[in-house]
Amino acid sequence: MNSVRAANRRPRRVSRPRPVQQQQQQPPQQPPPQPPQQQPPPQPPQQPPQQQPPPPPQQQPPPPPPPPPPPPQDRNNAGERDDVPADMVAEESGPGAQNSPYQLRRKTLLPKRTACPTKSSMEGASTSTTENFGHRAKRARVSGKSQDLSAAPAEQYLQEKLPDEVVLKIFSYLLEQDLCRAACVCKRFSELANDPILWKRLYMEVFEYTRPMMHPEPGKFYQINPEEYEHPNPWKESFQQLYKGAHVKPGFAEHFYSNPARYKGRENMLYYDTIEDALGGVQEAHFDGLIFVHSGIYTDEWIYIESPITMIGAAPGKVADKVIIENTRDSTFVFMEGSEDAYVGYMTIRFNPDDKSAQHHNAHHCLEITVNCSPIIDHCIIRSTCTVGSAVCVSGQGACPTIKHCNISDCENVGLYITDHAQGIYEDNEISNNALAGIWVKNHGNPIIRRNHIHHGRDVGVFTFDHGMGYFESCNIHRNRIAGFEVKAYANPTVVRCEIHHGQTGGIYVHEKGRGQFIENKIYANNFAGVWITSNSDPTIRGNSIFNGNQGGVYIFGDGRGLIEGNDIYGNALAGIQIRTNSCPIVRHNKIHDGQHGGIYVHEKGQGVIEENEVYSNTLAGVWVTTGSTPVLRRNRIHSGKQVGVYFYDNGHGVLEDNDIYNHMYSGVQIRTGSNPKIRRNKIWGGQNGGILVYNSGLGCIEDNEIFDNAMAGVWIKTDSNPTLRRNKIHDGRDGGICIFNGGRGLLEENDIFRNAQAGVLISTNSHPVLRKNRIFDGFAAGIEITNHATATLEGNQIFNNRFGGLFLASGVNVTMKDNKIMNNQDAIEKAVSRGQCLYKISSYTSYPMHDFYRCHTCNTTDRNAICVNCIKKCHQGHDVEFIRHDRFFCDCGAGTLSNPCTLAGEPTHDTDTLYDSAPPIESNTLQHN
């Protein structure tokens, strides 16, 4: 459609007559300069007029030759022009220490001289291989007789005695081809004619650039700093590369063509007043298609490019700021089929319609690139004030431009729009402050976008949708009003090594069945989640750093899926990964750490496979599972948290298997309020509040775990909880093995409980568990203790080799027992009593023996004070004493806390005045964090 519209609306081009071609038809007595290979053979030294481009009179050697005919006004007073930089005027006296040893001195006469410069001296002259510079062919060697002849006086004076400053002044009036011919005269002229100051002045008069513009190959232009360039004369080198071209310079064409003698030798330069004329002229003249657009504002020209032309701005300073092409009615530039190798660079391109909201402008753009063309757009500033459409539109099969170093900013619509199977390479562009997305990719568009700076957009940074694709690498995307990168409706981009940060909402937003691969990016400091995945989307998030977000790291909700793998997620204000509302991602091999909230938060029926992650040093729980969620957590390392390792609450379910859970400030695992997870084959150790805590009607199937080295009980069961524990090894705890109290229940079956500091199993306060086929042995206190009106069913248990004894039942406890084996226990309590020792000797802050304890009315002790039977017999003999009960206790007499000293105990110990039961665990409170 675009091609048809362009063909119908394109005006007829009429090229201007070119006086240069007329000059070539003049009589042969004034032919233009010929290329080097067509020059006549060099003449002997006694014929100086044929060797020098501006030959002086033969009879007046002392004065310099008269200048050529007066140049036009812009060349008058070439040494004092206002538009020539001051450093050129200051250095025009000669090459100085740069290029020549000739400083304010004259050459002495030489008896002999060669007929032409040496090969080394030619290196300073023209090095171009093009026919545009009229170099003489290398001189042939002259005979010895010719070398013995004396040079003519004028030639000697010009070549050997005239000061460098005077020669440079003469050379300053020459054009480029004359300078190249002068460089062929002798070594001294070669050095002076290649003076960079001469070429800089000449270069700026033609091209206006204040820095050399290099053009080493088609489609490649770049400016350099002359001081840093390896070539001794970059101005001349650039002149050679840019020599053959057309110049759009309004007002100058008439002057140029009306002074053919003044510009003799510049047949390879064409001048036009408009870009349209230049486009037609270079095609009719069979030029290479190089067009220089000089400083100015060019308005409402119809620029439809359907040939491989090269169009570049030419201006001093920042070139693109001073060459402005604008259209108010139609697309400013349209590239059509046939413009495969076209180049447009170093200019400002604007689309500025009068009615900025008109719908018919929806198809109008600053740049429009259509099917089967691959132009290069380089170093351009692109602006559009139209509120519909886009600034740059690339559409159609075979549309494959290269857009690089451009600034697409401050547009009232989309910055760059790639659609309908278009491709292309887009590198090093600045895309900012656009009203809509910085980049749209739609309908199978598949660009390669590298190192672009996409920021401060008033919408999303990059938006791929409706099957849009693309490869985005090393882009900096930040401070956009919506997400930095949005993927929607089956779009499938690849985003690699980009920085996506400081978004006013999120970093990456994938929704409505979006896909995509996000690999090795840095995603940080976004106001919402670093990555959002929702509504059946299934992206791959691999190897990214996602950190310091004002909310969470990765947020998956609304049936979202995706692979979250190998990421480093840390320092976020909310959960590192959040999974909710039936979402089911795969989360593996990530590091989730140092968050201000939890590590992984699964809620509202969230699912997912969470495996082989390392979750550590988070402020709240390492993993939260709640409100009907059923994730599978497998082979993770969850450690060093400031609260719980894994926390199931409010009907949280799921599978927790083969994990290492260790070194948490609270319990390794907590289960409460109807939660019923399957916890199996885990290693749970180093918890400051115990291994597993099941409370507030918690459930759970806890099987084949190893629970050890916890500061408190290996497993706590309390407050109407009813879990099942099978085949676990619970050992080496710094408190009891399993503590059940406050109405706790549960089935404990086939567990090995050994080497714990307190009772292997402590049952207290109205609890009623079932213990079946357990082995409880090698404990540092009792095997099983039942107290505080608790009951239990004990069937087929083996209780042996425990220090205090096998089974201890407090007063008022009724137990159902069947087929238990209680054997070979050390019975340290009975032995201490039989030896008359105070039971304080065998107790400690973590180990309370169960025996008869008393109070002494004579010593005014209270119910909170307990005295062992031996202290009653020895220390309180004859006192009014009262038997309290048979229970776990700590002898206050032996501890030295009563008024009378104990005669059986050793050093007194400060009494904590606590109840004689295991210290209660710390329960997590989640309400304030939900």
From Swiss-Prot:
Record-linked InterPro entries: Beta_helix, Carb-bd_sugar_hydrolysis-dom, F-box-like_dom_sf, F-box_dom, F-box_FBXO11, FBXO11_UBR-box, NosD_dom, Para_beta_helix_rpt-2
Null allele phenotype: Neonatal lethality. Newborn mice show epidermal thickening and increased Snail protein levels in epidermis.
Lineage top rank: taxon: Eukaryota
PbH1 repeats: 398-420, 421-443, 444-466, 467-489, 490-512, 513-535, 536-558, 559-581, 582-604, 605-627, 628-650, 651-673, 674-696, 697-719, 720-742, 743-765, 766-788, 789-811, 812-833
Tissue expression pattern: At 9.5 dpc and 10.5 dpc, expression is restricted to developing heart tissue. By 11.5 dpc and 12.5 dpc, detected in liver and subsequently in muscle by 13.5 dpc. At 14.5 dpc, still detected in heart, liver and muscle and also in the developing secondary palate including the nasal, medial and oral epithelia of the palatal shelves. At 15.5 dpc and 16.5 dpc, expressed in lung, kidney, heart, liver, muscle and adrenal gland. At this time, fusion of the palate shelves has occurred, with expression confined to the nasal and oral epithelia.
Example of a GO MF term: zinc ion binding
Gene: Fbxo11
Descriptive protein name: F-box only protein 11
Zn finger (UBR-type) location: 836-907
